[in-house]
Amino acid sequence: MDADWGEIAQYHTQLGYRPDPTNPSAHHSAPTAVAFDTRSELLWVGKDQGRVAAYVYFLNNGIMEFQRHIAFLSHPRQQGPVHQFLFNETGVISLGSHNVHMAQRGGMCLANIGHVNMTNLRCMTFTSRGTSEILVAGDQDTMFVIDLNKKQITKEVPAPNHYFLMKKSKYICAASRNGCVDILDPITLKVINTWNTRSAQLNDMDVQHDFIVTCGASLKQGTYMADPYVNVFDLKNMRSFPPISFPPLVTYARMHPKMVTTSIVVSKTGQMHVVDIANPHNPIVRQVLGHTHLALFDVSPSGQAMVFTDTEGYIHVWGPTSKAVSFVDQGLPVEFETEQPNFASIPWSEDFPVNMVGLPHYSDALLSAWPADLSSDVGAPPAQFDQAYVDAMMPNGNVGLYGKAVAGTRRNQVVDTRSADKPQSSLQAPKFLSEKARDGFKGLTMDTSDIETSEDIVPSPIRTDIESLKSVVPNMYHLFEIKFSKFGVDDFDFGYYNKTHHSGLENHITNSYANSLLQLLRFTPILRNLALQHAATSCLDQHCLLCELGYLCDSMEKARGASCQATNMLKMLSQHPAAANLHLLDGDRIASSSAMKIQGLLRFLLDFMSRDYGKTSPGINDLENATATSSQSLIRCDQCKSETSRPQTNYVQDLAYSPVTSNGNKGVDVADSYLAAQQGVARGRMAPAKLPSFSQILKKSIEREQVTRGWCTTCRGYQPLSMRKIIKSIPQVLAANTCISSVEEKKLWATPGWLPEEVGFIIDKEHIFCYEGAELDWLIKNGKYKLYVYSLMGLVVNIEPGPTFKPHPVAIINAAHSEPQKPAKSQWHLFNDFHVKPISAREALTFNTSWKTPLVVMFQLKAANNHIDSTWLQRLDTSILYQDQSPEAEDKSYTLLDRNKEAPTPGTVIAIDAEFVLAKDFEYAVNSDGEKETIRPRIHSLGRVSVVRASGDRRGVPFIDDYINIKEPIVNYFTEFSGLTETDLDPKTSRHNLVPLKLAFKKLWLLLNLGCIFVGHGLRSDFRVINLQVPREQVHDTQELFWVEAQRRKLSLAFLAKSVLNLEIQGHMHDSIEDANTAQLLYWKYKELLESGRLHEELKKIYAFGVKHGFRPVKVAGQSAQRTETPPMVDDAQPGALLPYQPPELLQGS
């Protein structure tokens, strides 16, 4: 407390009230509750008979004066006084003996919550859920948990004791009159410790950080007398401190909200001591009251003001007399009553047009703006007939006219033009692909490739080009769900939601909340390049997230706008040992919201991917250098002034919105140089605006100076420690979590143009300076300083449609920075899972405080933009293709490739087949009609994959035959179709050497990027489960090669083997080597038919044969069934000679 502290305002609480005839002495009654608002510059006072008033101060000729701002009744007068106040963003919560009242700061009632068991309430506090939930207790046996969002009681808890005070810090501390303080767990509300203060009766208690202070009274000669000391308890170590002496007899004790070891103690007569708990022998003493006695006492959240009330009803506000006082650090502006304009009288007459009345200005949807689906056709004009149709009508005797029948409609039918004129208020779901195909064969196909989804049609009368400014969430930001038919996810038309060449990510997979963040990482060129370079190395770590990011980036580039899925990446995240501990997984009971998980996941990914990169590059860690801010952390003890330092690495900056200085970059003289360069412009013109700029916030967050309490090795005790950073280097990729926690911070982001697309940094004299806008442009033009310019890559935004909808994150990315050639202008895109849409820069960088808030922002060094590295393709480590995973096995079904003779090259033909098991079955929901709807399709896992040579001397011989070690539970092995049994995939009983999924996947990924041509049957579904994206030019699917589109039916491998190759396969069960070998035989037969010009004719015969035999493979009369061996038998005399090809009856003209 400074020497200039004194009384700065005084006000009587009865001023402004009408006299109460039933209680003439009411004006002398003292307040029963007083508290500073934690969100606004208001002082709240509660009195008897349920009266609540808020007071606001203002300066009048330099003198601080108070006046009543608002007043209302929180409960009926007969229910007694107001006991306590709490505050949150919504309003003020006041506590009576029988109810909890919640009101807006303007006085409007939001909720009045009561219960039959609320008989004598005395105290309340917030729980572990922050300001959205409170715990209420009192001189009764029951405590209540109240959800402030739902405005209802959610839980009744037996009270361990009768409490009159509760405060929350790390724990909930509840004080009872008998001298004990119970320490409750804020989640379970169970007592974890009890502190006996040794007082016969407690009078007051306060909690801040790790300390509890209490004051009480002792029983002396039959009466209670205030104790001459303050009790102190250490919450961190759960032990008592020596009491603090206070000879004037303590009545109230408070902890200072800013100085963690400072306590303020006041006596009944008004003597006040400001004491340091660590050094209580030198208190600061003040006398705050004169001839009256103290009634109540409180300290403002900013620590700049104190309030005392006396027994005569006066409020005394203390603070520094030489400067302005603020109750809160960054408070909401006080809302005053708006003055209503005087409208001119309207001359109502028959000649006065009603449209001259006009409408007041409004920003929300009017009640009259009904959505289209609530409007009725009754009274609407009839449907319009086409005039040509009317002219062609024929007379029907003397009765009237009749119209000719038109193809596609019944007689006298026309199109209902009324329904066509109605606006569509939501996105129309596309048809399933199977439905489109069926309609196509009926001649009803409608081309939807050019259909533009109507985003402008929302139930709001406000017309704007910026969707983010609308009060209702536009369609393009809504959470889209995949609809499943009996054919599964493959039947969903993803192309309807994406007309760009950028691929979206499907969201029906566990942990798919990470899709937006994965998109942001993929569109950051430096991270993309390093991930692919690492994936091309020999890394086989099963938990390497960097490899998976590289595989995902490669898949999305090869997809060219087709839908992708991050199955393997998200599966590895689920199995990562650290992810569950950090509560980053879906289904975690103590996991936070998806917004908090996104911010935690960014920190987790950058940290662990940097470790992954270091495992294969033990020297210089390029990924750490590219993503980590290197600094020296200086820790200084405020007591002994000793200073220690330690190196620190930080991958993600958490933005801190505490007040910044007027010129955060002062010290490098750049701002002054810029001002001097502006001719004819006064220096005062460049003064910064009241709102801090993004660059100021970013600079302060990177340097982050803070004061905390910790152990000092010099003092050998816990002391206040000042911490600051000396920045050594900043990374090429700068990631930041927005950490928005208040309405003020949301409004800051919602300020137009607040987030710049470029920022610049200067590191000078152990400090970092950040610039944007005109200053940055001047620095770039000047070229005097070593300036690092960063471009905004994109951001992850949280969309909150409303209380009945689930919030979800989306990515907003400038794809121009990741193009190989720099485009002429920016290319902002919205990535809402599989819905991808180009948007304007204004749309991208406009935020809405009610439903669109940023979570993560990503900047990259501008010099690295558009540097897309492809050299990793020439540095692929292919050693795994030539390594035997089962060196000790005797009956191997494969023969490894010869590195010298059979190294895969672009155009090498290989045949592949995979077998799968069921990890999760369908999930259904029953609709109102009693019909089943699929809400989640079957989830398969790769069980076995086989790759066979399809060219060369050893054609038909497999070189990969891997059985997979599956981590998740298996629901069904599909033995009849997969040939896999439980003993094949159980590590304890399998006779095969089970390999990790990553090892099997990497072999296929290497073959893909070596340019091999994949031959198989039904490869689309195989590649989907494997999560491998193969370009069309590298796939020859025999299911598509032997398909006549007009026939609709696609033929099975067994039927084609019999009808084309005269081979019987899958006689007992499926075998992947046999199926892959059959596919490559069919492929070469197709090539033969195509080159000879007989393909079209033979396809007709194949379908005719199928119709005759029901499309099932049948034995040819007089021919024994043949079955290929696994591996296929090869003639030793003629290496690579296959079984002789015998044409079936249909190819012989039968």
UniProtKB/Swiss-Prot annotation:
Its cofactor is a divalent metal cation. Residues 1118-1150 are annotated as: Disordered. Residues 472-862 form the USP domain. Belongs to the peptidase C19 family. PAN2 subfamily. The keyword Cytoplasm applies. It is an enzyme of class 3 (hydrolase). WD repeats lie at residues 26-67, 114-156, 158-194, 290-328. Residues 326-471 are annotated as: Linker. HAMAP family: PAN2. One of its GO terms (biological process) is nuclear-transcribed mRNA poly(A) tail shortening. A divalent metal cation binds at residues 913, 915, 1022, 1075. Its main location: cytoplasm. GO terms for cellular component: P-body; PAN complex. Forms a heterotrimer with an asymmetric homodimer of the regulatory subunit PAN3 to form the poly(A)-nuclease (PAN) deadenylation complex. It catalyses: Exonucleolytic cleavage of poly(A) to 5'-AMP. Contains a pseudo-UCH domain. This ubiquitin C-terminal hydrolase (UCH)-like or ubiquitin specific protease (USP)-like domain is predicted to be catalytically inactive because it lacks the active site catalytic triad characteristic of thiol proteases, with residues at the equivalent structural positions that are incompatible with catalysis, and it cannot bind ubiquitin. It functions as a structural scaffold for intra- and intermolecular interactions in the complex. Its EC number is 3.1.13.4. Residues 911-1079 form the Exonuclease domain. It comes from Pyricularia oryzae (strain 70-15 / ATCC MYA-4617 / FGSC 8958) (Rice blast fungus). This is PAN2-PAN3 deadenylation complex catalytic subunit PAN2. Keywords: Cytoplasm, Exonuclease, Hydrolase, Metal-binding, mRNA processing, Nuclease, Repeat, WD repeat. It is found in: Cytoplasm. InterPro entries: Exonuclease_RNaseT/DNA_pol3, PAN2, PAN2-PAN3_catalytic_subunit, PAN2_N, PAN2_UCH_dom, Papain-like_cys_pep_sf, RNaseH-like_sf, RNaseH_sf.
